[in-house]
């Protein structure tokens, strides 16, 4: 298993922390707390921008940091509302540096925790087993790593064990999806996992993997933007077939959805 370095954005280049970012579940038993929870003096003096309602906000508050809850951490830095921003390492790498929206921000390498990213299907769905088999084959033949390299997340990949698809004996979700001819993928915009290119096409590591699964199913991929808080409702109501958008695999997620084997480990 490879681990990705954690990041924090810092306008003043004084300190770095990293934590979870947009649209993820609250960290549970998949998270590893910081090795040293004691706040040094310089940490106590700083104000950190965190996404309102995110796991990053929860981790920061648990560590006793001064926070300002915002919709855009990087924007808060540029407007001098905060000294640093807590955000997950994948998103930080995509939005900071030359050629990005925030070229003047810097990234540093102290971490708070780690999370596993995966996919959520309807509870009891055999689609999770199908996805595991596709990911295992993609890992074995190098497609998974090549796709990860395209979006700069190769260091975060989790090794995929060999896996064979086991179809449900009755009420097969895989057969339902094949019969209707589409795989409806619930997403939010979360670069580098799911985002739109200049032509409005959905791309990203998760988006490309979802397209691969749709190809193996012999159906068309359909991306639909969802309200993240309603993802389980959307699944159960068959408005979508899968949640595939940098989703943290937590105990709560596993209780309400059928989750696949994690594909990415993200340092916070």
Feature locations, PLM:
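A ligand-binding cleft/hinge motif common to bilobed small-molecule-binding domains
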Residues: 58, 78-113, 230, 246-256
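Short Pro/Gly-enriched coil loops immediately N-terminal to beta-strands
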Residues: 108-116, 257-268
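Bacterial lipoprotein signal-peptidase II cleavage site
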Residues: 18-28
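Positively charged n-region of N-terminal signal peptides that target proteins for export
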Residues: 1-9
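Extracytoplasmic small-molecule ligand-binding "clamshell" domains
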Residues: 29-42, 50, 57-58, 63-72, ...
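Hydrophobic core
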Residues: 13-17
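A bilobed periplasmic-binding-protein/Venus flytrap-type ligand-binding module shared by bacterial periplasmic
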Residues: 113-134, 268
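Periplasmic-binding protein-like
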Residues: 56, 130-155
């Amino acid at each position: 298993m490879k681990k990705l370095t954690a990041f924090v954005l810092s306008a003043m280049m004084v300190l770095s922390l990293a934590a979870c970012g947009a649209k993820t579940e609250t960290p549970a038993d998949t998270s590893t707390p910081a090795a040293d929870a004691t706040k040094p003096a310089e940490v106590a003096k700083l104000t950190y921008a965190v996404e309102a309602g995110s796991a990053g906000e929860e981790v920061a508050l648990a560590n006793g940091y001064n926070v300002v809850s915002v919709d855009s951490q990087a924007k808060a830095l540029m407007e001098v509302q905060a000294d640093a921003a807590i955000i997950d390492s994948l998103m930080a790498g995509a939005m900071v540096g030359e050629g990005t929206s925030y070229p003047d921000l810097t990234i540093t390498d102290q971490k708070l925790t780690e999370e596993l990213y995966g996919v959520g299907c309807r509870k009891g769905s055999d689609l999770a087993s199908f996805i595991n088999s596709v990911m295992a084959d993609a890992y074995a033949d190098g497609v998974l790593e090549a796709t990860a390299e395209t979006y700069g997340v190769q260091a975060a990949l989790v090794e995929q064990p060999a896996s064979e698809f086991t179809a449900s004996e009755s009420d097969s979700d895989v057969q339902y999806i094949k019969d209707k001819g589409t795989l409806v993928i619930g997403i939010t915009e979360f670069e580098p996992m799911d985002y739109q290119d200049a032509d409005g096409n959905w791309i990203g590591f998760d988006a490309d993997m979802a397209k691969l699964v749709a190809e193996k199913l012999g159906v068309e991929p359909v991306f639909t933007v969802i309200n993240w808080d309603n993802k389980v409702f959307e699944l159960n109501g068959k408005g979508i077939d899968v949640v595939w958008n940098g989703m943290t695999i937590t105990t709560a997620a596993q209780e309400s959805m059928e989750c696949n084997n994690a594909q990415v480990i993200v340092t916070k």
